């Protein structure tokens, strides 16, 4: 059957599998890239605040 110009084509099972695979890879990247980066940023902020607010011990 001919596809009408304005309508999107129906998703095939192959397209669905590819989309699921892409979503799985995106989730994998979140755990391997985003979380460690976020942890480093939080750690840097904590260290900066600690250094900035510690009492001076110069005599």
Curated annotation (Swiss-Prot):
The chain crosses the membrane at residues 32-52. It is found in: Membrane. Residues 9-22 have a biased composition (Basic and acidic residues). InterPro entries: DUF4519. Residues 1-25 are annotated as: Disordered. It is a single-pass membrane protein. Keywords: Coiled coil, Membrane, Transmembrane, Transmembrane helix. Residues 9-31 form a coiled coil. The keyword Coiled coil applies. One of its GO terms (cellular component) is membrane. Belongs to the SMCO4 family. This is Single-pass membrane and coiled-coil domain-containing protein 4. It comes from Taeniopygia guttata (Zebra finch). The gene is smco4.
